[in-house]
C-alpha cells in the first residue's frame, strides 16, 4: 500500500507541474514577451537546480528522502501560489526558479525510495515512471482547456489543488514507508566515499547519465517550445494541450510494454534505438505545420522519449552503490538542468532569427549525434553493486 500511495503522490505533483509549464509560455506572450525573453524565463526553471542537482542528491543520501520530499512539496506549492496571487513577469520568474529546485527535491527523493524497494528494479522504475506519465498526460490536457475557458489564475488554482492533495496524502505514510530512501546505517563505521568524479570514470555510468540528460532535456523542450510553435501556426491552447497529452499518453502506453521489450531485445539496444527514433520525430516536426500530422508525430515522440527516460535511470542505479544513489541521480539531473538552462537561451535566439521550428531541427541533430556516439555495453543487464541496509517493502 505505501508503494501505491507514493505513486499517487508522484502523479499529483507531476500533474501540478506539467499543467502549468506550457501555460507559462503561452501566458507570457499575452504579456508581450517573445523569443529571447521567453528563453530566459524557460531557462530560469533550471537555474538553481543546475547549480545544486548533485549536491541535492547528497542531501537526499544524508538527510533522507522523507524530509527532502516534504521540503520539495512545500516549495512547489509556493511556486504555484506566487503567480496565482500576482500574475506578472517578475513572479513568473520567481515561480520558475522555486519550481525547478523544489521539483528536484521531490523527484530525487521518490526515485531513490522506489528504486531501492524490494523487487525487480526494472519493474519498480517502470511503474514509477508510469505514474509520472499519467500526470504528464492529464496536466496539459486539463490546463489547455481550463486556460482557454477560465484563464491563467484558475489554471494555477487547479494545479495548486492537486499539489495540496499530494501534500495531504503524504501524511498517510509512516517514517518506515520511506525506509528505502533513508540514509544508510554504517554501524558506527565512517563511510569512506570516493569522489563522484571517480565513479564517472566508468564509461557506462557516464554514458547513462549523458543519455538521460539528453532525453530529459528533449522532453522539456517539447513542453517549453511546442506551445509557442503551436500558437504561431494557429493552434488554440486546447489543441496544444491535447497534442501534449497525446504525447504523454503514448509515453504511458509504451512503459506498459517496456519490461517485455527489454527482455526481448536488451536494455542497451532499446535505449539506443529509441534515442535514434526520437531524432527522426524532431526532424519531422520541423518539416510540417499541419496540426493532425503534428499530433501523430508527437505521439511517436512521446513513446520513444518515454522509453529512454526510465531505462537510463535503471542504468544509473545499477552502476552505482546504493549509498550514492541520491548523488548519482542528482548528477543525472544536473546534466539535464545544464542543457535546460543553456538551450532555451541559445534556442530563444535561434527561434527569434530562424523561427521556432528551427529549434526542433537543432535538437534532432543533437539526438542523432547522441545515438551514434553515446552507448552502453549490452552485457550489463543488472546491478553491479548489492542492495543493502535499507531495502524497503
Predicted regions and their residues:
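Cytoplasmic helix-loop-helix junction between adjacent transmembrane helices
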Residues: 97-133, 315
Amino acid at each position: 500500500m505505501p508503494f501505491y500511495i507514493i505513486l499517487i503522490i508522484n502523479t499529483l505533483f507531476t500533474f501540478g507541474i506539467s499543467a502549468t509549464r506550457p501555460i507559462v509560455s503561452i501566458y507570457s506572450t499575452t504579456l508581450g514577451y517573445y523569443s529571447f525573453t521567453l528563453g530566459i524565463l524557460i531557462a530560469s526553471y533550471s537555474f538553481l537546480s543546475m547549480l545544486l542537482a548533485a549536491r541535492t542528491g547528497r542531501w537526499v543520501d544524508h538527510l533522507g528522502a522523507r524530509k527532502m520530499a516534504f521540503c520539495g512539496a512545500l516549495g512547489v506549492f509556493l511556486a504555484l501560489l506566487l503567480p496565482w496571487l500576482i500574475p506578472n513577469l517578475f513572479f513568473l520568474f520567481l515561480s520558475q526558479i522555486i519550481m525547478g529546485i523544489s521539483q528536484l527535491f521531490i523527484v530525487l527523493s521518490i526515485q531513490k525510495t522506489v528504486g531501492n524497494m524490494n523487487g525487480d528494479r526494472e519493474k519498480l522504475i517502470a511503474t514509477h515512471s508510469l505514474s509520472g506519465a499519467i500526470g504528464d498526460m492529464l496536466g496539459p490536457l486539463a490546463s489547455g482547456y481550463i486556460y482557454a475557458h477560465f484563464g491563467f489564475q484558475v489554471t494555477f488554482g487547479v494545479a495548486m489543488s492537486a499539489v495540496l492533495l499530494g501534500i495531504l496524502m503524504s501524511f498517510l505514510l509512516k517514517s518506515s514507508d520511506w525506509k528505502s530512501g533513508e540514509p544508510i546505517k554504517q554501524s558506527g563505521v565512517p563511510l569512506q566515499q570516493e569522489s563522484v568524479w571517480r565513479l564517472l570514470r566508468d564509461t557506462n555510468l557516464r554514458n547513462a547519465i549523458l543519455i538521460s540528460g539528453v532525453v530529459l532535456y528533449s522532453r522539456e523542450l517539447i513542453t517549453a517550445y511546442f506551445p509557442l510553435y503551436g500558437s504561431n501556426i494557429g493552434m488554440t491552447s486546447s489543441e496544444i494541450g491535447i497534442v501534449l497529452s497525446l504525447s504523454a499518453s503514448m509515453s504511458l502506453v509504451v512503459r506498459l510494454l517496456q519490461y517485455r521489450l527489454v527482455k526481448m531485445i536488451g536494455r542497451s539496444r532499446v535505449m539506443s534505438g529509441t534515442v535514434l527514433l526520437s531524432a527522426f520525430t524532431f526532424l519531422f516536426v520541423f518539416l510540417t505545420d499541419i496540426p493532425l500530422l503534428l499530433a501523430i508525430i508527437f505521439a511517436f515522440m512521446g513513446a520513444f522519449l518515454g522509453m529512454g527516460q526510465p531505462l537510463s535511470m535503471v542504468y544509473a542505479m545499477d552502476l552505482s552503490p546504493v549509498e550514492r544513489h541520491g548523488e548519482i541521480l542528482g548528477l543525472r539531473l544536473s546534466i539535464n538542468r545544464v542543457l535546460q538552462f543553456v538551450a532555451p537561451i541559445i534556442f530563444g535566439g535561434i527561434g527569434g532569427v530562424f523561427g521556432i521550428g528551427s529549434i526542433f531541427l537543432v535538437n534532432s541533430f543533437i539526438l542523432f549525434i547522441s545515438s551514434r556516439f553515446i552507448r552502453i555495453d549490452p552485457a550489463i543487464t543488472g546491478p553491479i553493486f548489492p542492495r543493502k541496509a535499507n531495502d524497503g517493502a
